[in-house]
Amino acid sequence: MSLPAGVQRRSFGDEDGVLATRGEPAYGEPVVDGWRRWDAHRSKLGATFELGLDTGLSGGDAVLYLGAANGTTVSHVADFAGPTYAVEFAPRPVTDLLAVADSRERLFPLLKDARAPETYAHVVESGVDAIVQDVATRGQADVALSNRQFLADDGRLVAALKARSEDVTADPAAVFEDLLGRLRDGYEVRATARMEPFHEDHLAVVATPR
């Protein structure tokens, strides 16, 4: 699995082979020679890279990021991607996200609900190269399906599915099977991996539109 152009493994102190992107610091992360440490324990996409999944991201991609929160992960994405549309529903995290975007001209924060793509369809370009999804809400598969309209025919969905957001009492493996079955209504699932030890009860998914 190759990393996208603009993502490298660098040395930070005594640690070698640490994921990093080149850009302005966003959340107090260590920076060495202009390279920002990308902590997989704080980032589902970072963990997906560490798990070795082929995301299809190559660098310079147009990205729709669903569930941007305060910008921790999407700040790294905007360091190596092209235009990056960052959708977040909660006003408080968006305040931080706006600050992150100040130093990233390719990052476009959107205070919108990922469950209602019609509210930002006039802003997001059609045919994006990738949808990166980290939406901790019930109906995660439905979010991916409803946003499929933005994805290029040869694009990729890179999602982190959280079992507890769907059902806090059910066995996570059963929840993931249900979610994958629903995703297959509009996607071909290419790869999956449980995200332990980085994130408990999460599943990384890479899929292409059907």
Curated annotation (Swiss-Prot):
S-adenosyl-L-methionine binds at T72, T73, E88, F89, D113, A114, D134, V135, A136, T137. One of its GO terms (molecular function) is rRNA methyltransferase activity. It comes from Halobacterium salinarum (strain ATCC 700922 / JCM 11081 / NRC-1). SMART domains: Fibrillarin. It holds the Pfam family Fibrillarin. PROSITE patterns: FIBRILLARIN (PS00566). The lineage of its organism: Archaea, Methanobacteriati, Methanobacteriota, Stenosarchaea group, Halobacteria. Keywords: Methyltransferase, RNA-binding, rRNA processing, Transferase, tRNA processing. NCBIfam families: PRK04266.1-2, PRK04266.1-4. Belongs to the methyltransferase superfamily. Fibrillarin family. Interacts with nop5. Component of box C/D small ribonucleoprotein (sRNP) particles that contain rpl7ae, FlpA and nop5, plus a guide RNA. Its EC number is 2.1.1.-. One of its GO terms (biological process) is rRNA methylation. Involved in pre-rRNA and tRNA processing. Utilizes the methyl donor S-adenosyl-L-methionine to catalyze the site-specific 2'-hydroxyl methylation of ribose moieties in rRNA and tRNA. Site specificity is provided by a guide RNA that base pairs with the substrate. Methylation occurs at a characteristic distance from the sequence involved in base pairing with the guide RNA. This is Fibrillarin-like rRNA/tRNA 2'-O-methyltransferase.
